[in-house]
């Protein structure tokens, strides 16, 4: 099972709630106040947070829909609510939010709240992967799609495609150890000619998406 929390969460944890959502700062839950051990990085949002976020989500804001889905899935309002998480991930993903698309792909891959389907997982990972830049769900989608190609799940096993998506998931850096390790795993299965082919596909992809990168 792959982590579904969007990378933008780390910004939330470091600098506070997203300004665009105008959420209140997370409140320490009663269990924490009572001295019960709890993950200090796990956000806890108030009812006011939920009300504000839900209002924005209902008005069609894709980012708010994604955050609402994450909150329901992770239990940030108290108890996890997978059906509502799935509902809002689908709405946000349909609007093109890459974090939601990647998370929806992972729900299909893991069979969380839905019938497991590697085919649908690949579909949503691919949608996330096509976004530029590669931060957050786009980069995660590329890595996850690469893993499906590496393992032959939902798509034919294809080391060239796996290598290509792993390379793209790294963006302009190699400082993502798990993704770099995945790239190495694919390369070990390939001939030099196949690696050259994959590198060529990476450059072709970048050219096709050049306008989005500017």
What are these regions (language model features)?
Residues 176-214:
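Terminal, low-structured helical/coil segments at or just beyond the last alpha-helical repeat
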Residues 23-67:
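N-terminal leader/linker segments that initiate helical-solenoid repeat arrays
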Residues 35, 67-74, 78, 103-110, ...:
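Hydrophobic face of amphipathic alpha-helices that form TPR/SEL1-like repeat modules
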Residues 58-61, 74-76, 81, 94-98, ...:
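Short helix-capping/linker turns of helical repeat alpha-solenoids
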Residues 8-20:
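Bacterial N-terminal signal peptides
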């Amino acid at each position: 099972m792959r982590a579904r929390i969007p990378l933008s969460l780390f910004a939330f944890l470091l600098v506070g709630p997203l300004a665009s959502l105008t959420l209140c700062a997370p409140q320490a839950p009663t269990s924490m106040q009572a001295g019960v051990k709890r993950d200090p990085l796990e956000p806890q949002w108030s009812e006011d947070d939920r009300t504000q976020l839900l209002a924005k989500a209902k008005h069609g804001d894709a980012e708010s829909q994604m955050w609402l889905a994450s909150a329901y899935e992770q239990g940030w309002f108290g108890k996890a609510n997978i059906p509502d998480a799935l509902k809002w991930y689908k709405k946000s993903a349909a609007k093109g939010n890459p974090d939601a698309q990647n998370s929806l792909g992972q729900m299909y891959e893991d069979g969380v709240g839905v019938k497991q389907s590697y085919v649908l997982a690949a579909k949503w990972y691919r949608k996330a992967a096509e976004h530029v830049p590669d931060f957050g769900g786009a980069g995660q989608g590329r890595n996850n799609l690469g893993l499906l190609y590496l393992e032959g799940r939902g798509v034919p096993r294809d080391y060239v495609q796996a290598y290509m998506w792993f390379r793209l998931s790294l963006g302009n850096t190699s400082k993502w150890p798990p993704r770099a390790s995945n790239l190495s795993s694919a390369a070990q299965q390939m001939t030099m000619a196949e690696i050259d082919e994959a590198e060529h596909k990476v450059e072709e992809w970048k050219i096709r998406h050049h306008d989005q990168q500017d």
